[in-house]
Amino acid sequence: MFYAIILFILAGLAEIGGGYLVWLWLREAKPFWYGIIGGLILVLYGVIPTLQKFPSFGRVYAAYGGVFVILAVLWGWGIDKKVPDNYDWIGAVICLVGVSVMLWAPRN
């Protein structure tokens, strides 16, 4: 379980970090190499989920969606200095519960 959580976090950081660099390049006139590095990081994001032990592509990517929401709230708070409000935190907790149910609910 620890391995899965680490991979979810790494993938989320790669997705958000890569996307953020592309955003800075295109929206805030940063140098072209921001976009190149961001694109390479996004390719890495595409590879990381393949390291998961869960057999279902759909389930893994759905779970990444929930983790992404949580990490995006934290990224916005830490990097963009946008303090999350109560609704942001409530939404993040709901996503975390959903991810937990999807991945670790007992199945036959």
Curated annotation (Swiss-Prot):
The lineage of its organism: Bacteria, Bacillati, Bacillota, Clostridia, Eubacteriales. It comes from Desulfitobacterium hafniense (strain Y51). The chain crosses the membrane at residues 5-25, 31-51, 60-80, 86-106. The keyword Membrane applies. Belongs to the UPF0060 family. This is UPF0060 membrane protein DSY4629. It is found in: Cell membrane. It is a multi-pass membrane protein. GO terms for cellular component: plasma membrane. SUPFAM superfamilies: Multidrug resistance efflux transporter EmrE (SSF103481). Its main location: membrane. NCBIfam families: PRK02237.1. Keywords: Cell membrane, Membrane, Transmembrane, Transmembrane helix. Signal peptide: none annotated.
